[in-house]
């Protein structure tokens, strides 16, 4: 064999040995970890169940609060007034001033929460009960007033409108008088211009 071939064979065997030793170490580590994990999980499982099944209740009773010896115990009347007054002295810790149920009922500044009916908009979408629900409030039912005279004064070309109305009336009379009715009536544009210029 040649020398380069021997070097390649030796390098391949070394790589194969490293791979086998890595696999053996991983397998030993996994079995060791599995044994330790199973023993640890056996020890941890009862504790987990105890934590899940245990429960604690928190109560707020002034009689059972442990206070430092240098602070005097407040009477219930003082506690109810202290919840209204607030944090007056900075010598007392903040957690001593807690609200009792009586304070919420006696507090004049307490505002009841908004009821859910306030936010329901059903009253806006329901039809009104009046029989005249579709009429407008600002419409006066009565004789219709003719606004033709008022409209004539509003426009600058009111004279042209009056001339046009007269011509339309003449055209209608002319059309009715003839046996065959034309689709339209041709009028002389110079006559209209003379009338408009007056």
Curated annotation (Swiss-Prot):
Modified residues (Phosphotyrosine): 136, 155, 184
Protein origin, superkingdom: Eukaryota
Cytoplasmic compartment residues: 25-198
Record's keyword annotation contains Transmembrane helix: yes
Residue ranges that the UniProt entry lists as topological domain Extracellular: 1-4
Sites of S-palmitoyl cysteine lipidation: 23, 26
Subunit structure of this chain's protein: When phosphorylated, interacts with GRB2.
Protein known as: Linker for activation of T-cells family member 2
Organism name: Gallus gallus
Source organism phylogeny: Eukaryota, Metazoa, Chordata, Craniata, Vertebrata
Gene encoding the protein: LAT2
């Amino acid at each position: 064999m040649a020398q380069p071939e021997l070097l390649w064979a030796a390098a391949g065997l070394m790589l194969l040995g490293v791979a086998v030793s890595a696999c053996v170490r991983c397998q030993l580590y996994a079995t060791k970890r599995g044994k330790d994990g199973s023993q640890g999980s056996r020890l941890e499982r009862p504790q987990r169940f105890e934590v899940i099944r245990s429960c604690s209740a928190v109560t707020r009773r002034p009689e059972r609060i442990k206070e430092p010896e240098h602070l005097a115990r407040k009477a219930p009347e003082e506690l109810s007034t202290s919840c209204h007054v607030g944090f007056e002295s900075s010598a007392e810790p903040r957690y001593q001033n807690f609200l009792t149920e009586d304070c919420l009922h006696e507090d004049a500044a307490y505002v009841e929460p908004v009821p859910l009916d306030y936010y329901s908009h059903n009253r806006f979408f329901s039809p009104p009960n009046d029989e005249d629900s579709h009429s407008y409030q600002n419409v006066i039912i009565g004789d219709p007033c003719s606004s033709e005279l008022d409209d004539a004064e509003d426009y600058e070309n009111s004279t042209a409108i009056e001339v046009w109305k007269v011509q339309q009336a003449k055209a209608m009379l002319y059309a009715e008088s003839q046996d065959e009715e034309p689709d339209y009536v041709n009028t002389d544009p110079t006559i209209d211009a003379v009338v408009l210029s007056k």
